[in-house]
Amino acid sequence: MSAYDVAPSFLRNSKRPISSISTTTRPAQPSSISVRPIPLIGDIEKGDDLFTREDFKLKPDFVNRPLWVCGDGRIFFEAGLFPEIANPVGEFLVAIAEPLCRPKHVHQYQITVFSLYAAISLGMSSEEILETLFKFSKNELDPKLTDYIRTHGSRIGKLRLVLRRRRYFIESPVESLIKTVEQFYKIHPHKLTPIEKDDESGIYSFEIDPNAVEKVKEAAYRDLQMPLLEEYEFKGDSDLPTIEMALRPTTKLRPYQEKSLHKMFSGKRARSALIVLPCGAGKSLTGITAACTMRCRTMVLTTTAVAVDQWKRQFEMFVAMDPNDVITLTADHKQPLPEDRPCILISTYSMFAHSIEHMSRSSAAVMQQVRELEWGLLIVDEVQVMPAKTFRQVATIVRAHCKLGLTATLVREDDLIEDLQYLIGPKLYEANWQELEEKGYIAKVQCVEVWCEMTLPFWSAYLNTSSGFIQRSLYTANPRKLTACEYLVRLHEQRGDKIIVFCDNISLLKDMARRTKKPFICGSVSMQERMAIIRCFQHSNRINTIYLSQVGDNAIDIPNANVVIQISSHYGSRRQEAQRLGRILRPKSYRDEDGFNAYFYSLVSRDTPEKEYAERRQRFLVDQGYAFTIISDFDARIDSRIADGEVFEYMDETVARSLLRQCLEGSDEIENETADVRVADSHTAVSDEQAERIIAQFSGGPAPAASGRVVSVSSLTGGSAGFYR
C-alpha cells in the first residue's frame, strides 16, 4: 500500500500518480503531561533498558496479562492486544496514574504521589491498588514500587481542609499527622488556634489564616507530600440555603459525563476535583449537573463575556429553575446579588484580576458581596488559565466548600499546570478522546501536516536577514503555503464543507481574506460585524469559509464547521493546537469513505522553525491518540494545477513581490488581542439586512431568503436545546 493511501481520500483522487506524492504518518511518542517533569519513583540511569534488568521478573503466564509495571512507576498497557478488558483496565489506570500517551495499541501511564492522591480520594486503598496491579501485571512488582504506594497511601486522605462558617480548619483523625503539619515551618506561622480534639468524632483540628490558604495547601502538597483533601458534606449542611433547581426531563447525560460526576460525588460528599473532557464533549453540562446535584450557592468562573452568556443560557436550557436566580457579572453587566436567597453567579477571570480599590463603585460593591458570602460550589471553566499569577487568587477570594475545574486541555507551556492539584484538587477523570470518537460523541478528525517549499525570493530573503521577526514574517507568508491554503479551500468548498482558516498574523489574515473574497474576524472587527459573519457562516450555503485570528481560539462554537486550515499560530503552543482542533469536534452525522468527517490541516514552510513548532504543538493531540499524516510534496500537486491553467492569487509574481516587500518592511501586524477575545457580544443581535449584506459582499450575488429571525449569541455558541438529546 502506498504511503499516500493514508492521506484524505479526496486528496488521493488526482490526475497525478499517487506514487509521486510523498507522505508519512507521524507516530505517537510519549511526552510528559506538563513541562515540569513528573517525579518518578526512583531513578533510571540513562540508557537503562527496563525490560532487560535483572530485577524485571516475568510471570510464567505473562502473555495473558496486559500490563508492564516498572519499578519507577511507569506502566505500559497493551490495549490493542486485550480489547475485551481494555475499558475496565483503562479506567483503573486512569484512576491511579497519569495518562502520558494513549494511541491505539499501547498506552503509557505514570504513577506519582499526586495520582495516588486522586486514587485514594476516590476511596481506593493502597492494598486494593497493589492487588489490582499484581493481577494484571506481566511481571512481579518491584518492592520499591510497593513500598512507595504503601507509604504514601497510608498518609494520603488522612488530612482535610474544611471551610466552616467562613473559617478554614485542617482536620485529621491521626494526631501524629496533624502535629507534623502544624509544626512544619511553612505552615506554623499561619496557625490561628492550637490543635483541639473533638471528643465525639475523635477528629483533631486547628484553624489557619484564610489569607494564607494557598500557601498552606502548597506546603502540604509540595514539601510534605501530604495533600489536603477538600470534601464537602453538602447534604448535611444546614448553614447554606438551597436553590430550587433540577435538570429538565429532556436533559440527558452521556455515559462518560455520568462517570465523571460519579467520581466527584460519593454519597453525601462532593470532592474538589479536575475533570478533563474533549472540546465539544459537554463540559458545561457536566458542571451544570454538579450544581444541580448540590443545589447550593454556586459561582461559575470562565474566560470571556461570551462564555458567561453561554453558561447562563445553558443553565436556562438544561435546568428547571427561576431564571432570576442566574446572575451575571461582567465589565458591562454588574447586577447586585440577591440578599434574600442563594443564586448562581457567572463571571470572568478578569473581574477578579484587580483589587477592589481599583474597581468602579458598582463592581466593588458586587465583589464585596462575593467575598463575604460562603459558596457551596465554585466551577472553574478552562481551568488551565487559573494558575496564572493574575487569576490564581480567585481560588481563595471565593470561599467555596467544593471546587470543580473543567478543561479540554490540561496543559500550559510553563511550570504552573501542576499547581491546580492544590489550587483545585486532584484530577478524578480524564476522558479517552479516541474512545469518544469511536462511539460518535465527537467528530472523527483526520489531521494532516502539509510541508511547503519556500519560494526562491522568500528563501533568499530568509537566509539574508538576521532579524527573527522578519524571518517569521517570511516563513509565515510563504506564497506556496498560502497557495496550498487557497487550493484546500477550493477543494473543500466544492465538497460542501464549512471551513475555518486560522492565521495569527493580522495583516496577512486581512490580505488573504480580501484577495480570496472571504469574510474575516479579528480584534478590530465590530461586534455587530462578527455576529453577522458568524450567522451567515452558520445558516447560509453562500458563505462557507471564514478567516479567524486568535480571537477564534476560545468562546466560539460553530457546530457545522468541519475543516480547519492553520496558516500561522502561537509558536509551539499545545493548548492552542488542541483548542483549534476543538472547533470541529462537534459530532457530525456523515463520514467519508475512510470514516472521517472532519479535517485539520497545519501548513508549514520547510526547513524553517515552523516545522519544529508544529511538532511541538502536536504533542498533546498525539498523546490523545491522533496521528498526523505528513504530505511532504504537496507543491507538485499545485504545480500540476497551474500547468492545467488554474490560477492562484499568491503564485502571481506581482502579488508575491508585494507580499515580500511587506514582510521586509516589518509590517507583520500581530495584534495583542488578549484583551479582546470576544467573538460576539451577548447583547448584540443581527438583522436580516445585515446578514444579506455580508452574503452579497462575499458571495458575489444577492443573499438567499433570510429566516426572518433575530439571532442571539446563544444559537451561535451551541445553545440549542437539541444538542444533548
Predicted stretch roles:
Residues K334-L337, K498-F502, S507-D511, K517-D553:
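Conserved helicase ATPase core of P-loop NTP-dependent helicases/translocases
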Residues V306-D332:
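Conserved helix-turn-beta segment of the N-terminal RecA-like "Helicase ATP-binding" lobe
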Residues Y547, N554-S569, Y599-S602:
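A short beta-strand element within the Helicase C-terminal
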Residues L463-R514:
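Conserved interdomain hinge at the start of the Helicase C-terminal
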Residues S2-D199:
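Extended alpha-helical interface modules used as scaffolds for assembling large macromolecular complexes
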